[in-house]
Amino acid sequence: RKKKNCFSAVTLWHVLEHINDPVKELLFIKRLLKKRSHIIVAIPNTSSYDNSYYGKYWAGYDLPRHRFHFNPAAFSKLCDKVGLKIKSTIPMYYDSYYVSILSEKNKQSIFSFIKGLYIGFISNLKAKKTKNYSSLIYVLEN
């Protein structure tokens, strides 16, 4: 028997970008939720400064494991398509450091740790104005 309306919340911490069909998956999860329940999604943000800085070396792309890539506008369209409301967006401040360090390693950079920390800091500083942090947490309501 398929369960319906049995959960108050479902979390997807850096999961959605790995799924072959995000629309199908979100619709499936939505059926599992009670009314006015939440899906919490954390995903890399392709509109972040660290992405524009690193380009093809940006670790947030994580090809081929990441099947999809989102910025806030694309994620909002996805949510509209499946009938979910974005209730809030929360920055993941530490992801810019982690992703930048990995991106420096992708570039085979000398002092990748120090350079990554610096670019991660700059990314967060710029995101204070743009709200485009390296990764974002979306709280969705059905």
Model segments located where?
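Conserved SAM-binding loop
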Residues: R1-Y54, H69-L84, S135-N142
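Short, flexible, glycine/charge-rich loop motifs used to bind or transfer phosphoryl groups or to couple energy/partner
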Residues: R1-K2, K56-W58, A127-K128
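Conserved glycine-rich, hydrophobic/aromatic-active-site segments
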Residues: H66
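Short glycine/proline- and charge-enriched loop/turn segments
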Residues: Y54-L63, L102-S109
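Active/binding-pocket-proximal capping segment
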Residues: Y57, L84, M92-Y93
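A C-terminal cap/extension of S-adenosyl-L-methionine-dependent methyltransferases
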Residues: S88-N142
